[in-house]
Amino acid sequence: MVRQIAPSGNVVQPGCSEWGSFTGFLILILSYVASPQCRTIFQVSHSVSASSAPYRLSDALNRHIPGLKSTLLLRRRKEIDGLEIHRTPARRATDALRRHLAHGFDILLPERRKDLPFSLNVLGMGFDTAQMEKADVVHLHWIGGRTVDFSQLCHIRRPLVYTLHDMFACTAGCHCTMDCGLFQDECRGNCPQLGAPRLFRNIPAWLFSRKRRAFGRIPSLTLVTPSLWLKREVERSCMFPGRKIVQIYNPVDTDLFRPAEDRNAIRAGLGIPPGAFVIACGATGLFNPVKGGHFIPLVLEELYRRGHRNLHLLLFGNQEKSVDYPFPSTNAGFITDMNKLAGLYSAADIFLNPTLQDVLSNVALESMACKTPSVTFRTGGVPEAVLDGRTGLVAQQGDLNQMVAHCERLIQDGKLLQTLAEEGRRHAEQTFSYPVIAARHAALYEETFREYRYEE
């Protein structure tokens, strides 16, 4: 049973100058220590890595908020410290059934787009609610697919905070809407991602309705979006009527992601010739329609056609297929060491990020913190990180010529490149750093904890 009392304070909104200053941060810490209420937070997610938002948030809270302990609660723990979600014995037997259901879904919908993720969240994993209730606040992150059963969330007798890292929570099951607006009308109609035969075209609407009923039964649920763009998208959906939605950016560790002391030494170690203009980009997304990686070879070919020869391409991540580039390239492979990743960002002059839909873009935050400006498209929440003409250059979505022109401008204008790099570092420290984002989350947890009480 839930008894709701008046909230004790206001949720910190983005852009408040007091949180961008040391004074505002110090006031929050002192008030928190003087009257500690919310002590333990569980960050619930399918799995995490050292580069994922749940891990970084938990790390930021533990390092910068005295008296608060954040613990990762994961379906798959892997090498990251944390706890595993306790599954109920009865639900362990449903693992095989879930796999068969997913296979049957593909058989029923042979035209479904395989290059875009779609999660059913049917027969999700049952979990031990008593384990969740050891926390003061339960913070949900990547819980789609088989991580937890949404219908069971209402049984957790603790206030829930849910960060939406993509569009999954407010759609029938797709994670990237790619300009589809059906989620505004309960996903009724012919879903462009599923390509369902007429007989099965009601599946998205049924999935949407099922998910909305599950969320509607949760007594205490506060939504967090990592960008203003996603906040507006969630408000357009009818999935969460009347729910509080707060915008708080994802954090980046600006002590870790910072300019390297000797960039030339890193370049030499990578075999990059002295004096080359280095363009970095992600190799993993080259064939992902959401990441827009197909623009990368097109941009490079046009730069070559325009006479630029002293360029070097630095790739991060696993490249699924061989691609011919007009310039020498170095592929650093899949990086798990964040110190090494920071060094790679520092080795580059610019980061080419042609994503076509992104909530915020962690790679933009990381490169910016390392004083490496991004050239990117105006899409999703990316322009909130890459401020056009201040911390990077932003082209209209899909405009190849403008993206090439932006790259060419930075190749030719070293003074502008340096200005963007300096301002980008300041923007990262003032807006996305661990202390700033940890303070905003701590304030939200405290308000959520005080606003709701659960009677045993």
Give the positions of each predicted feature.
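Carbohydrate-associated surface elements
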Residues: W229, P251
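Short hydrophobic beta-strand element within catalytic cores of glycosyltransferases
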Residues: P373-T376, V386
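A short, well-ordered alpha-helix in the C-terminal region of glycosyltransferases
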Residues: Q402, R409, L416-T431, I437-A443, ...
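Membrane-proximal helix-turn-helix segments that form the acceptor-binding/catalytic region
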Residues: H155, F168, Q184-V224, C238-P241
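Aromatic "clamp/platform" in nucleotide-sugar-dependent glycosyltransferases that forms part
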Residues: L356
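Conserved donor-binding/catalytic core segment of Leloir-type glycosyltransferases
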Residues: I272-K291, P297-L300
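Conserved acidic donor-binding segment of nucleotide-sugar-dependent glycosyltransferases
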Residues: D388-G389, L393-L400, R409-K415
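Nucleotide-activated donor-binding/catalytic signature segment of Leloir-type glycosyltransferases, i.e.
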Residues: N310, G317-A342, I350
